[in-house]
Structure formats: C-alpha cells, structure tokens
Amino acid sequence: GHNIVGTIFVECSAEYRDSGPQSLKPVGETEFVISQAKLSNEKSSRGQPPILGCVSHANLMLGEKVQEVLEEHLSCAPKGFVKGIRHSVAYYPFPPKVGRYTGRLPGLMNRPDFREGFSMLAKFQLSFDAWLVHTQITELTDLARKFPETTIIFDHFGGPLGIGSFSGRQTEIFPLWKKHVTELSKCENVYAKLGGLAMPLNGWGWDLRERPANSDEIVTLHKDYYLTMIDLFGPNRCMFESNFPVDKFSVSYNVLWNALKKIAEPFSIEEKSCLFKETASKVYKI
C-alpha cells in the first residue's frame, strides 16, 4: 500500500473569482483550496491525507505590480500555507494537441516585465514552479542563474514533447533533453519534481488505449528519465510527484506510485526518503 501523509495543491486555473480586478481573480483558487484544506483536516483522522499548502497563480507579466497579487494570496491564507507561484510559461512551437496552450508568447522567461515580476517572489519568500516544455529548458537555466535567491521547482522533467512535429521522436530528443537538464542541474537553486511524464503531450499513446499503462510499462519507458535526473540533481534535490489528475488519462494513481517504487528500488533508505518525502518537505516548507 501507499502511505500518503500530506499533499500540496498546485494551481490549475480553477475556482477563480467572478468579479474584481482581473489580476486578482486567481486568488479565488487559493481561497477555494483553503476551504478544501479545512475539510481535509477534518477527514485526516479517517485516513484521508490533509492538504498542507498550495502553489498559487499570479501573472508575473504584471512586473512589480504583481506584488499586490502576491500580498492578496498571502493575506487570505493561514501563515505559510501559500508556498509559491506557478505562472506556466509552456510554449509549443506547433499547433498543440492540448488547446489550452494556444496563443502563448514564446520567450516569456526572457521578457523584462516577466523578470520584473519574478524578482518579487524572493521578497515574499515564495518559490516558483516552472512548467515548460523541453525546447525552453535553456531559458529556464538563464532565469535561474539571474535569480539565484529564488527557489525554482522544475516540473515534469521539462515536458519532453512527443506530439505534433515531435511525434515518435523520443529517442532522438532524449540526448538533447539530457544535455539541457545537465546545465540546469548546475543551478543550486533548482529542484526537480519528477513525474508528469504520462500526459498526452508526452506522446506515449497510453491515453488513446482502452486499458491504461501498467507499472512495468511506465518503468520501461520512463526509467532513464528518472535515473538521469536523480544522477544529475542528487536525491536531495529531487522529489517524486503524481501529477494527478492530469496523468489519469494514462495511468491510475496506485499504479503510478507502484512504478515510482520500482524505479527507486536500487536506492538507499536515506535516498528513498529524500525522493518520497524529505525533498518535498524542505522545498515546500511542510
């Protein structure tokens, strides 16, 4: 069995405020998560893991004006509940299979207004969850070097693409991906959140099957990604994640954690502790 003792909610553009300034509407999601956290605490005695915090959304393109949004997130929540911010910068250089990513600007992390907004995070001791795709990893490396005081969580292996013009090219893309994450790993302020490789955009095709993937299939196709990241970053800078509910298109929750346990089998007890708990506890301050 799996002993899930606590969870972190990561923004998903849900439950925004219906009124008020556009910039502050994402605070509604934080308010919603707080209400759910109270319910989860009530149910924790019955075996349901509590929500221990959240990663909220703020539009960093607001520049220094994003400070008002950050203050609103923090003021509506219990102290320490809001752990960080995710402003997705994922940009696909082709018409995507997933429509929500259309209309985004390329090179967002290089823009002065984005960087001005990003610079506000350290002031509030907030981390940054970086959701991007593999063609953007070098941009994130540059951002991490420019802001060493800000903790960055590298989400989902940097989104190795396997659809559109990248369909069927996983073997070709892997060495380039490895080269870029090797440089990123040299930034000590970057931590790796390992999971999210079973999304439709990764191109394994499990979402199109009648039966979801089993744990052995996941290990066979994903193990090299996991072992590469753990080798480069070290277990003390890596944490396993479920990326649910998005990964449920391809795999069940229990099966995914079974796969992660199989991947982690060669590591020591101390290293496993980092991968399954300690790194996440340190980074998200729980």
Which residues does each predicted region cover?
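Residue-level recognition of the N-termini of beta-strands and the immediately preceding loop/turn
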Residues: 5, 49-53, 82-83, 190, ...
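Mid-to-C-terminal alpha-helical segments outside catalytic/metal-binding sites
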Residues: 1, 5-6, 224-239, 246-286
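Tryptophan-centric aromatic hotspots in well-structured domains and transmembrane helices
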Residues: 9, 32, 57, 128-131, ...
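Short, solvent-exposed loop/turn segments at secondary-structure junctions
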Residues: 12-16, 59-62, 90-92, 135-136, ...
